[in-house]
Amino acid sequence: MSPVSSRVSHGQSTLRTVQVLGGGSAGSSAHVRSLAAGLVARGVRVTVCAPAEADRAYSFTGVGAQHVHVPRSSDPVSVAALRTVCADADLVHAHGLHASFRAVLALSGRSTPLVVTWHNHAHAEGARAHLMRLLERRVVKAATVVLGTTSELVDRARGRGARDARLAAVAVPRPTAGYEHPDRSCSKVRAELGAIDRPLLIAVASLDPGRGHELLLDAARAWRLIEPVPLLVVAGEGPLRAEFQRRIEDEELPVRLLGRRDDVGELLAAADLALLPRSWEARSVLAQEALHARVPLVAARTGGIPELVGDAAELVPDQDVDAFTGAVIRLLGDPERREALRDMGTRQAATWPTEDDTVAQVLSVYDELTRPRPLT
């Protein structure tokens, strides 16, 4: 474990931090839980401001942090609630663009240091893209330090006017073997899903626009020509579920929508391939878990995926149905390539920062920003 906060080691009052989170991203939510656990263990007082559903899903209170329900909204009531929580904070750390913007509003007129972490590339088009650029400029100019989870995000923050932008060592908790039900074997999981004598493919993402599920359904039409026909299972819930289910039934696609699951680790461990048709996360949780679990990954070359996985996955152009379909078919027919990807994935995962690395870096930033200034 990395050292405790320098404030604690020098007998100063406990460092009080507020983590601001929207709760809409699995990657940033998992990161905040991991960060909170590490900070609490090192003597830092942590309050997480996030929607109640985020605490139910990630149990910030379970790792020793205080949780305060703050809606994912920039309305005056929500901003006022956040401002109240931040009143006695030594430092505020916001995760993601929208959470950061709310933190900027809440800290208006105060000198409290603000650390901002950008976990993904916010994707937008047209008028929304212009608004996004304005928000980004407002946030990075107000932030004391901006942490970007990829070099691309660091460059983006600097281009928007950040005073101090740094590359962040961000890790999510590594899944452990056995997961939630250690006695539940891979063969049992496959039997429950109906994939005993056929390949099992898995995708994990909310059923929202822009996640690439339409591409997967298009690809599934071609996969019907393979013998045996692979089964694609999609773990995740969202507003497009009914639309996708109708299409699956109308076209008789070999796809099952599983809804929200708490056993994703077991599903992944039982799969032959993990599929990531699109991700704007800088450090995709699914990509990390797939490589840790030695499950070959097929992914679109978007966001931070290339930097994250290197050569340890099959990467295809974004929104290229034929390329994605072909990559899956080739991998299913090439056991030697799958084994090579497993080994390369293990080596690539070993190069990623650990949770301890992440906490150590963040804590060093906190100490730097809250260290008493010498009198001049």
Report residues per predicted region.
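N-terminal strand-loop element at the rim of the active site
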Residues: P3, T14-L15, Q19-V77, L153-R156, ...
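Short His-centered aromatic/hydrophobic patch
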Residues: A94-F101, W118
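A short, active-site helix/loop in glycosyltransferases that binds the activated sugar's phosphate group
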Residues: A143-R166
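Conserved acidic donor-binding segment of nucleotide-sugar-dependent glycosyltransferases
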Residues: D311-D322, R330-E336
